Amino acid sequence: MSDTLQKLPLFPLNLVLLPYEHLPLHIFEPRYKLMTKNAIEHNKPFGIILSEGKGVFSKGVKVCVEEVFKKYSNGEYDILVKGEEIFKVKGTEMDGDTVVGDVEFLPTQTGMEGPQFQKFQESYLKILLKFGVDRDLELHMKKKISFEFLQGLQLPLILKKEIININD
């Protein structure tokens, strides 16, 4: 883990996003419209973090806006974000109406290799074929990081919370 804390605007939602995962969002609240505008205009990331009751989960994922589907005249946005890095929140402060976290980024996974990975990859491809996924197999063959294998799966919130905590 890095000892350097970075400031990151936080967007609490009732979900856990994982690295490499895409999420379409409709941004309509004034404080998040401003945060989104800044992210788009200055190519700046923000963090998506699970909102739990009156608080927030201590971990989240840094996201970048990959695509702006629509910008409305009232400042609302339809966007697509992609999860990048897991972070741990060490503290928060308010910047106007936006919650800004002092975050520590956790180590990024590197690609898997070796005989054990080859066995895993073969099993993964067999499962895909068993369920009739026979398109884009080459794309599936290129996956090397565990989060890439989770793309497209509808996992329960509780399981995603466990997955994001594995780094600890």
Regions found by a protein language model. Name each.
Residues M1-D168:
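N-terminal low-complexity, acidic/polar interaction/targeting segments
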